[in-house]
């Protein structure tokens, strides 16, 4: 894995266990993490939970477990992507490239003097600064969560199906997309809604998809 990423031009730092990965994140400039579920000392699940307390860096989890429940768990704890072993190394490279592109866009420099802002009620996205606020309070979103919310905010009132959301954000065919999108939608609601079970902004249209409600 390290070899193929090097061949594709990426600089790779290797940690031998989860604790070393956390220390490396504090001392090195890291733009993406690939964590194995079975890492010693601190496994990939617990490492992801710890990282998500303070950092929105893209995380790809690797696991030999292919069941939907394991994938949902990985996404539930804040991972941006989940791959089951064995996998094609070129697919990993493609996913790394995709996650880094989103992360770079999310943290990109502002060059325009006119801000691009989308608002509904107390929910506000400044797409130049890549900032999300609710009633003036800053909200921390992962790159995937931000891009989903931005897609819906740009098209307030329009219903997007799960497949449309997946294909727009992941840029790949929506195979098995239901659980993946649903988990990220739930995370967004937990961060922007006062009561996620009775959302004001991010609504579901049963049997169709999701939308940002016009207020």
Put a short name on every predicted segment.
Residues 2-7:
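Charged docking surfaces used in two-component/phosphorelay signaling
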Residues 16-20, 43-46, 70:
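Acidic catalytic/metal-coordinating carboxylates
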Residues 98-159, 163:
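Short, Lys/Arg-enriched segments at the junction into DNA-binding effector domains
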Residues 28-34:
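Active-site beta3 strand of CheY-like receiver
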Residues 9-16, 24:
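Short hydrophobic/Thr-rich beta-strand motif most characteristic of the beta2 strand and flanking loop
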Residues 39:
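Receiver (REC) domain active-site loop signature in two-component systems and cognate sites
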Residues 49, 53, 58-119:
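Basic, amphipathic DNA-recognition helix from helix-turn-helix-like DNA-binding domains
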Residues 115, 140, 185, 189-215:
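DNA-binding patch around the recognition helix
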């Amino acid at each position: 894995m390290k070899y193929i990423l090097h061949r594709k031009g990426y600089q790779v730092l290797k940690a031998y266990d989860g604790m070393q990965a956390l220390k490396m994140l504090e001392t090195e400039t890291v733009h993406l993490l690939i964590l194995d579920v079975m890492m010693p000392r601190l496994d990939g699940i617990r490492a992801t939970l710890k990282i998500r307390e303070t950092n929105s860096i893209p995380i790809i989890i690797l696991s030999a477990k292919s069941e939907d429940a394991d994938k949902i768990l990985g996404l539930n704890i804040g991972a941006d992507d989940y791959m089951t072993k064995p996998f094609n190394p070129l697919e990993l490279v493609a996913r790394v490239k995709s996650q880094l592109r989103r992360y770079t866009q999310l943290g990109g420099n502002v060059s325009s003097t006119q801000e691009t802002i989308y608002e509904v009620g107390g929910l506000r996205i400044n797409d130049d600064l890549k900032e999300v606020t609710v009633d003036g309070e800053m909200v921390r979103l992962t790159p995937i969560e931000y891009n989903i919310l931005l897609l819906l905010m740009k098209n307030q009132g329009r219903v997007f199906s799960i497949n449309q959301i997946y294909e727009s954000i992941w840029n790949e065919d929506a195979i098995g997309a239901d659980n993946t999108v649903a988990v990220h939608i739930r995370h967004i609601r937990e961060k922007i809604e006062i009561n996620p079970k009775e959302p004001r902004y991010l609504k579901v249209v049963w049997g169709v998809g999701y939308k940002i409600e016009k207020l």
